[in-house]
């Protein structure tokens, strides 16, 4: 289970330390890909395999299914942690997420999001205004 938010430096080689609490959950490998909100998504390999199977089951005749495949698979990188518990963020993904020297790693239970520090702050700031409407909206789902 991945929970919490952690700010880390991205070094000149694009290396980002993954929080120590998260590393055991990534021992079987991981996949890094583009997210939906100009962020990056980091999946443990077992979770990625399940997600990929569901995406691959979508009909290729639907434009939205093709676009989802492009978003999730075209920029994806199969990675591993180095001895210091870091991953290398590929340049194309750093550019997509506008990550320069600071990144925020957030636990999303079964996967991890990686944000530029600036973009994450914008997301947090929006919560103050949107929280009541969000609470009302998700109540329809029984949450």
From Swiss-Prot:
Pfam families (alphabetical): MraZ (PF02381)
InterPro entries found in the cross-reference section: MraZ, MraZ_C, MraZ_dom, MraZ_N, MraZ_sf, SpoVT-AbrB_dom, SpoVT-AbrB_sf
GO molecular function per UniProt: DNA-binding transcription factor activity; transcription cis-regulatory region binding
Subunit record text: Forms oligomers.
PANTHER family from the UniProt entry: TRANSCRIPTIONAL REGULATOR MRAZ
Span of domain SpoVT-AbrB: 5-47, 76-119
KW Aminoacyl-tRNA synthetase (keyword) present: no
Keyword rRNA-binding appears in the UniProt entry: no
SUPFAM superfamilies in UniProt: AbrB/MazE/MraZ-like
Subcellular localization, as worded in the UniProt entry: Cytoplasm, Nucleoid
NCBIfam families membership: division/cell wall cluster transcriptional repressor MraZ
GO BP: negative regulation of DNA-templated transcription initiation
Name of encoding gene: mraZ
Protein name per the record: Transcriptional regulator MraZ
Recorded GO CC terms: cytoplasm; nucleoid
Family recorded in the similarity comment: Belongs to the MraZ family.
UniProt keyword terms in alphabetical order: Cytoplasm, DNA-binding, Repeat, Transcription, Transcription regulation
CDD domains cross-referenced by the UniProt entry: MraZ_C, MraZ_N
Primary location recorded for the protein, binned into one broad class: cytoplasm
């Amino acid at each position: 289970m991945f929970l919490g938010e952690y700010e880390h430096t991205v070094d000149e080689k694009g290396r980002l330390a993954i929080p120590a609490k998260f590393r055991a959950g990534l021992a079987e490998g991981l996949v890094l890909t583009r997210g939906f909100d100009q962020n990056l998504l980091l999946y443990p390999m077992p979770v990625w395999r399940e997600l990929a199977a569901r995406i691959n089951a979508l009909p290729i005749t639907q434009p939205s299914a093709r676009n989802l495949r492009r978003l999730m698979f075209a920029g994806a990188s199969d990675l591993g942690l180095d001895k210091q518990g870091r991953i290398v963020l590929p340049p194309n993904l750093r550019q997509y997420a506008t990550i320069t020297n600071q990144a925020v790693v957030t636990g999303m239970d079964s996967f991890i999001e990686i944000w530029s520090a600036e973009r994450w702050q914008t997301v947090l700031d929006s919560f103050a205004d949107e929280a009541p409407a969000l609470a009302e909206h998700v109540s329809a789902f029984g949450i």
